[in-house]
Swiss-Prot record:
InterPro entries: MmgE/PrpD_sf, MmgE/PrpD_sf_1, MmgE/PrpD_sf_2, MmgE_PrpD, MmgE_PrpD_C, MmgE_PrpD_N. Coiled coil: none annotated. GO terms for molecular function: lyase activity. This is Uncharacterized protein YxeQ. It holds the Pfam family MmgE_PrpD_N. Belongs to the PrpD family. It comes from Bacillus subtilis (strain 168).
Amino acid sequence: MSKQGLTAGLAEAVRTSQPEHSVDAIHEAKKGLLDFTAASFAGREDKGIQKLLRLIEDEGGRPLVPVIGQGKKAAPLQSAMLNGFIAHALDFDDVHSDVRGHPSAVIVPALIASAARGHDERLLGAYVVGVEVMARLGESIGSRHYEKGWHNTGTLGAIAAACAVGYAEELTQEELEKAIGFAATQSAGMRVQFGTEMKPLHAGLAAQAGLLAVKLAQSEFGGSRTALDGETGFFSLYGDVEKAQHTLLNDWGAPWRIVQPGLWFKIYPFCSAAHHAADAVRQLISEETISAANTERIEVIFPPGGDAALTERSPKAGEEGRFSVEYVIALALHGHGLTVEHFSSQPIPNGVQTTMGRIQRVYDNAIQPAPHAVPKGRFTIVRAYLSDGRICEARVDCPKGAPGNELSEEDIIEKLTLTVPQEKARRIITAVEKADIKEFLAHIE
């Protein structure tokens, strides 16, 4: 990188970006916007939404921005928080392997709030820039950040959202440097909250923080212009400043991270770390006719640390089960679909809980990861020991939806039409195809 600091360098990279020149990047942004909308409408009845709506209605504010799927509007900062929560409520929103978290649930709500205030022309390009920033932050912060217990969606998302909105609203170099700092000082989110309502709120709070950071910078509020740098800066506190100096800005946009490796669009409403196992157990059910009735026990084999996000081993409700490979496998073995209704606050049936007790996690660092694995170095093997003495197993390195095994545009449209009334879905799809953001906003409320 150049001799300028990380904060100044990032601000300059954002300010001078030209993502609109990449047909592929804008195409992927449109797919991402449709998937974001599908995930948001799927989560529109989550009980946490009404709690947050009551909170902001008590506070008041100017209702300018649509709250997705609620038939209401909210003030910009409030909407960013709400829409981030809604998008991430079911863990049905996209992930990015470089981020080790959820970029769109943070970036898009902040951009929707910005667009509703008249900054809609550059939304798709700003989305590309936001994903670029968040992916590079994830790569630069290092794996130890997540392993220590930080939730990257929250800790990296605020800066990414600030950069995305800063690009959309064409901030100056000084304003961007300050906005990055204002976002960095609000960066937070702990994995101890996984399996609770607070976990998806991390996305909402990060979106809100990024939007607030831009508004503060535009208001000439005072703050550091070097918040990513030095011994007390973001990377020194949260990760590895030396690594960041080599990775944060190199080969910016070449290719754009929204294109390569790309967003991972989900077919299941639970943590992506369990998607490998879900595909594997469904394969065994289909090919080997295994079930809860004929399976004595199951081993789920990960590389060390491959299940770090799967914090729940004995969940009591489907909501906690979003982070439990035991629940996902047991649910499938009992013949249930891995669909939204099974990952709510309802208690887990006794039979499923009994089967969960026969599922054991195993870690093996001798197994060679596949070159095409997503995320890099990851795999899951599901090995079933059957009552007739057979042992059968299935290995998945790149689950359905992940880059390299991605969902088609038609798959994403189907995901949207399953959660949105047909006419509304048609209007949303047309608006996104035409990059008509005003029309898009008119139909997501």
